[in-house]
Structure formats: C-alpha cells, structure tokens
C-alpha cells in the first residue's frame, strides 16, 4: 500500500474517470458530468453555494481552453483551489 498522498492522488484519478466519458470523451467531463461529480463527491461545496448557477460558474472558470468540457488538468485545478480554501479556513479557525 502506498503513502497517504499516493492514495489521495489515486483517488483523484479514480473519481475523475468514474465520472468522465459518460457523454463523449472519456478524458474530459461534460457540464453534466461535472455537475454529477460535484453533487456526488463535493456535495458540501454545492450545499454552501446558494447560487443556482454555481455549476455554470465553476465550469466557465475551469474551462481554460474554452472547449465546453473539463479535462483532468482543469479538474485538478478545482480540487487544488478547494483544498487551499479548506486549508485556509481550518488553519485560521483553529
């Protein structure tokens, strides 16, 4: 078994691929696939968002190349940004 960080990396990869490719390119998330991923894996994030257009806004910000889909690199940017925000929140409140 690998380290905690290796396990976390494997989980990031597995979660992405569990949701990608259901509507097309298996290496990208469509808007629907991204929404499903967020609802399944980051439901707390969506619960905090009171904005009904939150997924649209996340998609627009992540989709750096403007192809209407989120590739693995763009997905990792989302996870990294949320991780930084969580780190700041928990360390500032402790």
UniProtKB/Swiss-Prot annotation:
CDD domains: S-100A1
GO biological process, one term: regulation of heart contraction
Binding sites annotated in the UniProt record for Ca(2+) 2: 63, 65, 67, 69, 74
Traits of the deletion mutant: Deficient mice show unaltered baseline cardiac function and heart rate, but display deficiencies in their contractile function in response to beta-adrenergic stimulation and enhanced transsarcolemmal Ca(2+) influx. It also significantly accelerates the development of contractile dysfunction after myocardial infarction, with a rapid onset of cardiac remodeling and a transition to heart failure combined with excessive mortality.
Keyword Coiled coil assigned: no
Processing and modification events after translation: Glutathionylated; glutathionylation increases affinity to calcium about 10-fold.
GO cellular component, one term: sarcoplasmic reticulum
Name of a matching Pfam family: EF-hand_1
Functional note: Small calcium binding protein that plays important roles in several biological processes such as Ca(2+) homeostasis, chondrocyte biology and cardiomyocyte regulation. In response to an increase in intracellular Ca(2+) levels, binds calcium which triggers conformational changes. These changes allow interactions with specific target proteins and modulate their activity.
Protein name: Protein S100-A1
């Amino acid at each position: 078994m690998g380290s905690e960080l290796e396990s976390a990396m494997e989980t990031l990869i597995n979660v992405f691929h569990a949701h990608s490719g259901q509507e097309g390119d298996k290496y990208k998330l469509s808007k629907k696939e991204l929404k499903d991923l967020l609802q399944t894996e980051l439901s707390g994030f969506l619960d905090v968002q009171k904005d009904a257009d939150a997924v649209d806004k996340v998609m627009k910000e992540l989709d750096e190349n403007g192809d209407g889909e989120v590739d693995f690199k763009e997905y990792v940017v989302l996870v990294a940004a949320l991780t930084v925000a969580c780190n700041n929140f928990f360390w500032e409140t402790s």
